[in-house]
């Protein structure tokens, strides 16, 4: 049974049991800023389990794409060297949100494994938590698993409820026992059952984990039963496929074998068991799907992790003899394997290919040099009998050649060596400002709140008169009262304040009554439907239960709305001008501008920018109304609404039709396109490989920008004594005049240098048959110095010469040596002798070299020492 069929049977089975098939969420979690990547099926349902994200279904099933390659869950080091470690994997899961519990969860799992997948019952073992008699009895008495194949696992991690069979979401909150299902590969494979000393062997392999969210744990460790008990299960598709296909390594399943063969093809390797092929086959999945979900190789956060994975794959290709880009060629093979299950992969095939190719080309420019340095260093360590690579060198590879530490460690491990990581960390700390560490995600949500959700009125109103204070926070802790001068967070039952979301900044404004005034500086979500007003109490005292008038800064909101609505129009225009591959990859909309990141592989031309501006301004002139509708997500997408990167959507979504644009959006917008006024792009540039950024302004900001631009044009025209319409022609004339004058100046400098050269030749001192000259040439540039040295070499026949010039506090140096003397006196060494004394360095050929310096005061002494330096070598 192929992996694709296994996935399909899983989803269809649970659909037949009343579960809703929910699409895989993005690898970039939309609801947990503390998590680098989605690493399990339950991540997208976290808020559902917590009760803050209601869904129209109580049973769900998913095939969730997942990555474990950064932060706490990091399998990168083991990938390619073990049978079951991957950076990317698919987690099959079924979920119950206060619906069925242990009985049905266990029965469903057993039926699927033994009836649908037809696994032999006598090959299946199960574990339960030591105290979970209920699960034990279901397995033994209802399912009929022999008691000798049911193993109780206690607290085996050093604390109460710290067990392989007890799951927790954190130190507090939902938790409960779990039961795991294992497959026995038989006595021919070494290993013992779970809980035994030999459990780490490969005979008994965990294939499914059923978690029962049964309790809530408080800060004191007390357990109370949850009013709604839930189920979260997870089964790795790759592990299950290995069992069903009767192989002992995930890399032997059909999906991986096809990718390994493709990797062998592009690397021209015939041995399909080579571990490097496994690494490459694994990494193309992680890299491709991360790019699909909007992650781009970079130097921090998720982009840094992606870059590490890409470069690790490239390094393994390099190890196999590939000296040029190859990795991106596997995208088509991956699409053939997984494009049907994940249409978004097929749609993004060209973009993924382009991003990977660009990253490869960039890395191959430096990998050979970096690898040669690393190999030489390792050889030196081995020659001395050592086993540890210097951490300073590892940092140099990281900082100069783009080698992540784990890549260097990977190479070391293959040689039986390690890296001095403390020394690496010390070097990193000294350069912390330039090399910011990856993976430090700051949570913007963290206030404990268990009350009712906030009712938002901001789509229709800019003020609400009877808003009641339901919670107050100071320094992250809940309080009952806030005093004047204190910074605080206020939660209201009703508010017109928009909380930062979807790229749009939160509102500012005032909360007030007759005795109290609270200035709101920002508005952020405390939970999905709970809005926090961040600011300072300027007057009076504020208590839970107080009633206030909540009023936003209407002018700021209006400017923000103009920019947000313009963003929708610009997105559509970009797709018309540049192509349908353009997708939003990030945005920031505030009162001053809109900043929009999108997928595109080349800088926009001036003509393309003008066309986008023209399209948007035409839509503004049409003054089309904005129409908002709420509908099911699937219906909205089928109707042509565009879903945006990084956003988390519920099953009911808000669709905005604005002019020719239709997008899913929960933000605030203008009533008609004409309200935007004027649209102008002011910045276009690149932020990462395959990602461009534009910044644009609207309304009064755009008018002011055009007026200032017009004023500068008039000033420039006046300075050149021309009309504004003649400015381009006049600038061209001035440039021609400058070019002509520079040519004349160059000729004069050459003439001056020639005459000075004749005088300098007379200053040369003969040393052992070689004329030595070290002098300063006033007013010369590097070109003039070089020409003068050449003339002096011709004139003196046998010579070692250093000429210097000083301009703007900087020293320029040129050294020249005739062929007969260059065997003993090298121009590069000679120029460095002088350069080191004037605060610089340089290099070049044995007969000609150049350098610079920043300490001209030391130049006379440095030149005076040239004769003695040459004399020592002759």
UniProtKB/Swiss-Prot annotation:
Binds 1 zinc ion per subunit. Its cofactor is Zn(2+). One of its GO terms (cellular component) is cytosol. PROSITE patterns: AA_TRNA_LIGASE_II_ALA. CDD domains: AlaRS_core (cd00673). GO terms for biological process: alanyl-tRNA aminoacylation; negative regulation of DNA-templated transcription. Keywords: Aminoacyl-tRNA synthetase, ATP-binding, Cytoplasm, Ligase, Metal-binding, Nucleotide-binding, Protein biosynthesis, RNA-binding, tRNA-binding, Zinc. Its EC number is 6.1.1.7. It catalyses: tRNA(Ala) + L-alanine + ATP = L-alanyl-tRNA(Ala) + AMP + diphosphate. One of its GO terms (molecular function) is ATP binding. SMART domains: tRNA_SAD (SM00863). Zn(2+) binds at residues 564, 568, 665, 669. SUPFAM superfamilies: Class II aaRS and biotin synthetases, Putative anticodon-binding domain of alanyl-tRNA synthetase (AlaRS), ThrRS/AlaRS common domain, Translation proteins. It is found in: Cytoplasm. Belongs to the class-II aminoacyl-tRNA synthetase family. Catalyzes the attachment of alanine to tRNA(Ala) in a two-step reaction: alanine is first activated by ATP to form Ala-AMP and then transferred to the acceptor end of tRNA(Ala). Also edits incorrectly charged Ser-tRNA(Ala) and Gly-tRNA(Ala) via its editing domain. Consists of three domains; the N-terminal catalytic domain, the editing domain and the C-terminal C-Ala domain. The editing domain removes incorrectly charged amino acids, while the C-Ala domain, along with tRNA(Ala), serves as a bridge to cooperatively bring together the editing and aminoacylation centers thus stimulating deacylation of misacylated tRNAs. This is Alanine--tRNA ligase. It comes from Burkholderia cenocepacia (strain HI2424). The gene is alaS.
């Amino acid at each position: 049974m192929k992996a694709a069929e296994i996935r399909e049977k899983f989803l269809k089975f649970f659909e037949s049991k009343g579960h809703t098939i929910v699409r895989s969420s993005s690898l970039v979690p939309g609801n947990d800023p503390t998590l680098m990547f989605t690493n399990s099926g339950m991540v997208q349902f976290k808020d559902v389990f917590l009760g803050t994200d209601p869904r129209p279904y109580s049973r769900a099933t998913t095939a969730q794409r997942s990555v474990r390659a950064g932060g706490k869950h990091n399998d990168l080091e083991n990938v390619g060297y073990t049978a079951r470690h991957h950076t990317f994997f698919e987690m099959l899961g079924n979920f119950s949100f206060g619906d069925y519990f242990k009985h049905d969860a266990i029965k469903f799992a057993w039926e699927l494994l033994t009836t649908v997948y037809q696994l032999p019952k006598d090959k299946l073992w199960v574990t339960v938590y030591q105290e979970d008699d209920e699960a034990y009895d279901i397995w033994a008495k209802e399912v009929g698993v022999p008691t000798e194949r049911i193993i109780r696992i206690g607290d085996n991690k050093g604390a109460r409820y710290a067990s392989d069979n007890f799951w927790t979401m954190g130190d507090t909150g939902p938790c409960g026992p779990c039961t795991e299902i294992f497959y026995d590969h038989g006595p021919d494979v070494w290993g013992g059952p779970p809980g035994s000393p030999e459990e780490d062997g490969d005979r008994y392999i965990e294939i499914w984990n059923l978690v029962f969210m049964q309790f809530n744990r408080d800060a004191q460790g007390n357990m109370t039963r949850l009013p709604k008990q839930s189920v979260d299960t997870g089964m790795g598709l790759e592990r299950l496929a290995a069992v069903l296909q009767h192989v002992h390594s995930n890399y032997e399943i059909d999906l991986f074998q096809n990718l390994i063969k493709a990797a062998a093809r592009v690397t021209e390797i015939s041995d399909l068991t080579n571990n490097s092929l496994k690494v490459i086959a694994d990494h193309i999945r992680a890299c491709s799907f991360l790019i699909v979900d909007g992650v781009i190789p970079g130097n921090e956060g998720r982009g840094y992790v992606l870059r590490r994975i890409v470069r690790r794959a490239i390094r393994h290709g390099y190890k196999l003899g590939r000296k040029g880009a190859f990795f991106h060629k596997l995208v088509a093979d991956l699409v053939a394997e997984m494009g049907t299950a994940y249409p978004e992969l097929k749609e993004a095939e060209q973009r993924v290919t382009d991003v990977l190719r660009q990253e490869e080309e960039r890395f191959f420019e430096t990998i050979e040099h970096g690898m040669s340095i690393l190999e030489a260093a390792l050889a030196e360590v081995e020659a001395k009998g050592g086993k540890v690579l210097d951490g300073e060198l590892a940092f140099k590879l990281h900082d100069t050649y783009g080698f992540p530490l784990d890549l260097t460690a990977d190479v070391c491990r293959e040689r039986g060596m390690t890296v001095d990581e403390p020394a690496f960390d010390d070097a990193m700390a000294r350069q912390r400002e330039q090399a910011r560490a990856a993976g430090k995600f700051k949570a913007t949500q963290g206030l404990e709140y268990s009350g009712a959700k906030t009712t938002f009125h901001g789509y229709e109103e800019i003020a609400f008169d009877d808003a009641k204070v339901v919670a107050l926070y100071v320094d992250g802790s809940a309080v009952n009262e806030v005093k004047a001068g204190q910074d605080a967070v206020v939660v209201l039952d009703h508010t017109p304040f928009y909380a930062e979301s979807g790229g749009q900044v939160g509102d500012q404004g005032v909360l007030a009554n007759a005795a109290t005034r609270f200035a709101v500086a920002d508005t952020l979500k405390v939970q999905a439907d709970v809005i926090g007003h961040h600011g300072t109490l300027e007057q009076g005292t504020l208590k839970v239960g107080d009633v206030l008038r909540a009023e936003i800064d209407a002018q700021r909101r209006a400017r923000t709305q103009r920019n947000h609505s313009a963003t929708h129009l610009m997105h559509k225009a970009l797709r018309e001008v540049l192509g349908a591959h353009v997708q939003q990859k990030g945005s920031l909309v505030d009162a001053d501008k809109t900043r929009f990141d999108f997928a595109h592989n080349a800088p926009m031309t001036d003509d393309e920018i003008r066309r986008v501006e023209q399209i948007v301004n035409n839509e503004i002139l049409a003054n089309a109304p904005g129409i908002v509708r709420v509908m099911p997500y699937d219906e909205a997408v089928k109707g042509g609404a565009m879903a945006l990167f990084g956003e988390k959507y519920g099953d009911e979504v808000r669709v905005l039709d604005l002019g020719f644009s239709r997008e899913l959006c929960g933000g605030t917008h203008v009533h008609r396109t004409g309200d935007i006024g004027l649209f102008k792009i002011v910045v276009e540039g690149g932020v990462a490989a395959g990602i461009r950024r534009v910044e644009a302004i609207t309304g009064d900001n755009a008018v002011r920008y055009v007026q200032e631009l017009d004023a500068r044009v008039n000033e420039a025209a006046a300075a050149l004594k021309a009309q504004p319409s003649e400015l381009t022609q006049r600038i061209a004339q001035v440039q021609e005049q400058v070019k002509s004058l520079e040519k004349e100046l160059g000729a004069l400098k050459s003439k001056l240098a020639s005459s000075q050269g004749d005088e300098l030749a007379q200053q040369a001192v003969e040393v052992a048959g070689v004329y030595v000259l070290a002098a300063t040439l006033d007013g010369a540039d590097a070109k003039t110095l070089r020409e003068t040295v050449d003339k002096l070499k011709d004139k003196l026949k046998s010579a070692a010469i250093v000429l210097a010039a000083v301009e703007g506090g900087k020293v320029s140096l040129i050294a020249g040596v005739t062929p007969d003397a260059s065997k003993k006196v090298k121009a590069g060494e000679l120029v460095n002798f002088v350069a080191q004394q004037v605060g610089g360095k340089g290099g070049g050929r044995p007969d000609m070299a150049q350098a610079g310096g920043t300490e001209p005061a030391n130049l006379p002494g440095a030149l005076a020492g040239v004769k003695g330096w040459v004399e020592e070598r002759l």
